[in-house]
Each structure stands twice: as structure tokens, then as C-alpha cells.
Amino acid sequence: MMRLVRRLGLSIAVTIAAVGGVVGLGLRVRPKPFPAYAVPAPPLDTVEIPAGLPEAAERFARASMGEQAPVIHSAVVSGRGWIRLGGVKFPARWRFVYQAGEGYRHYIEATLFGQPVMKVNEYYLDGHGRMELPFGVVEGEEKVDLAANLGLWAETVWMPAVWLTDPRVRWEAVDESTARLVVPFGAVTRDTPEAFTVEFDPDTGLLERMVTLRYRDTEGERKGWINEVQAWMEAGGMLIPSRVTVTWEDQGEPWFSLEVEEAVYNVDVDKYIRAKGI
């Protein structure tokens, strides 16, 4: 009997190891990129960099855009990377659709062997957030709305001209390489401003990281939320981040890494931003 139990235990251990090995191989396979967003982008109008910016913000504006800032109304940004779910780092591909300063749709696929094993549609439209997750839908929560609004303004790093051209946005000086970015609320009424502390590279003037307090779920309090830029690329007459990591401060390591492969500006997204999937 004991010999049978030992053999059974060995068999189970071998099976678990084999399954774990197969899954490990699947996690190494990068998914194919999404098809290019096949809508021609129009030429972008430009305006002068506004006067009166804090030193760090003005240096960033000129380092990333030159003397003129493009006027951005919408964007479709696509790429790949990875997302950490339950402690496991899954390859991912994603497409984010924006109405500048107003709303977004996130479509994310976590993959195994290059095939989707989880699909997520997240929306921030008309000032309200909605998350369509495999285990249910989250909406109608003020904390979700506030978190989504901060997400919108953090992701505006892919269209940084909006931080200069939207009259609701305000920059405040901190020091030579740091500034405070104050952003509007969306549909939620609050007395305390929503703001990011934005740190810039003292040598290049380019943005290094954005830090704020953000809700992670509908139950807890705000937690430190960090967006860090790892690399840059040219798109739409601007330098935009080509690689970004997102970290909850109390977790100590990124849970999402995004590598941009395409950014298209001022295309019609009125229907696409309310759609599902790719």
C-alpha cells in the first residue's frame, strides 16, 4: 500500500511539473501585435508652447515637442508588453482609444502561447468608469470613476500636448526637475484637486515618472501609484514614451509593462471608443 501511495505521489508530482513546464513555455511566447489601425491620420495643427509654465514643465515641453505643440483631439495607441495576474507575468497585447482629456477605452489581452486567455474591456466615458472583466462588471462606483479619471490623465503622456492645450490643466512649480500637474475631475465633484507629482530627467528634460494617490478597488483607501517611462519614440511630431511601467507603491514591483508599437492621432473614434475588442 505504501509503495502504491509513493508511486501515486510521484506520478502526481511529475504531472504537476510537466504542466508547470508547459505553462512556463507558454508564458515565454509573445503574442503577435494587433493589426495596424487602418484609418488615415490627418495633418496636425500646432500652437505655440504657452508662456508661464514652470521651468521643469517648459523644458519638458520643448524637449518633447520643440517650439510648437500639436493640437490633439483623439488617439489610438497600440502595443504589447506584459501584465501580472495573481503573481504570474502574462504576455499581453493592448489597444487604448482616447478622446483627449475626456475619455478612453482599454482593450487588453493576456496570452498563453500567443493566444488570449483573458480579455478585458475598460471604459471611462462621460465621466464614469466601467470595467468588463472575466469575473464580472464593475461600474457605478465613485472610486472607480476617480481612479479612471487619473488613469486618463496619466496616459495623456502619449499625447503630452494636451497637458499644454487643455485650459482645465494647470502646472505648478516644485523645483528645477519636478512639477505638479493638476487635472480636472470628470463627473465627480470634489473640493481637493487631483494632482500628480511629475519628475523629469535633469539632463534631457524628458519625463521620468508620475506619482499620485489612486484607488485600487472599491473598498480600500487611495494608494501610491507610479508610472515610469523607460524609453522614448517619435510619433505625431512629439516624443512619446515607447515603454512605460505601472506600479502600486505598496507592491514594490510593476504589475503592467506597456511597449508602444503604434500611435495614431486625430482619427475619428466616436464609435470605436464605445466598441468592444479590437
Annotate each predicted stretch with a short phrase.
Residues M1-A18:
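N-terminal Sec-pathway targeting helices
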Residues A18-A36:
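Membrane-interface motif at the C-terminal end of an N-terminal transmembrane signal
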Residues R30-V76:
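N-terminal leader/targeting segments and the immediate start of mature chains
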Residues E58-V137:
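N-terminal mature ectodomain segment of secretory-pathway/periplasmic proteins
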Residues V71-S78, Q99-Y107, V174-V183, L207-R209, ...:
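Short, hydrophobic/aromatic-rich segments at coil-to-beta transitions
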Residues A110-P116, L133-E139, T212-D217, V246-G252:
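Short, solvent-exposed aromatic-acidic interface loops
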Residues R130-T189, T218-G220, K276-G277:
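Flexible, processing/modification-adjacent segments and terminal tails
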Residues L181-K271:
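Gly/Pro-enriched, hydrophobic low-complexity segments
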